[in-house]
């Protein structure tokens, strides 16, 4: 089990040298819509690369054509695939067909299925691409939890809950403000598998690999 944060230009004052050593992983906003690129993303990604920190990168969905948004995401992060975990941040009025089109374009062009971040109810509508791991946002009633907080059981969805954002006002040493804090129910090896990093002795993504982290959750990666 890993604990980490997701950040964007809204945390422009965050100093990686102060905060990142205190977390297990970092997910950075990379793009939005068809024209926005987060100027802080690459600096944070390079810190993670230099220091061996698991990391991810996400696209914030707008309501443009999903193919154009996917291409914008890929074009501006092409050298991230195979190292970090790609994510679609689904918070707007996009329908399920929009989401599925986006993630399938990403997979078709990169060979990697992105995670999908959303509230549980969005997944529970049914029909969301099952190859994509679910990163859910659901907040227990607690003020300013840290990375050591136990939020209990995550809400159920229609698929695998691999990551849970359990607060938007979390606190992490090295940063004075609120942060999104998360639990990943897997190991560093599982994280790398989602990113498409080849494991030792393998030339491609693992096939049929299961990683059991505790008595409640199992992360399974199956090549399609």
Where are these regions (language model features)?
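Short, low-complexity, charged amphipathic interaction modules
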Residues: 204-224
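Flexible, glycine-rich phosphate/dinucleotide-binding loops
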Residues: 35, 64, 123, 143, ...
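Substrate-binding cleft of extracellular glycoside hydrolase catalytic domains
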Residues: 1-112, 131
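Histidine- and/or cysteine-centered catalytic micro-motif in compact active-site loops
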Residues: 60, 91, 119-121, 139
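Intrinsically disordered, low-complexity boundary segments flanking structured domains
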Residues: 44, 75-77, 121-125, 144-154
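Aromatic-lined carbohydrate-recognition surfaces of secreted/lumenal glycan-active proteins
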Residues: 111-124
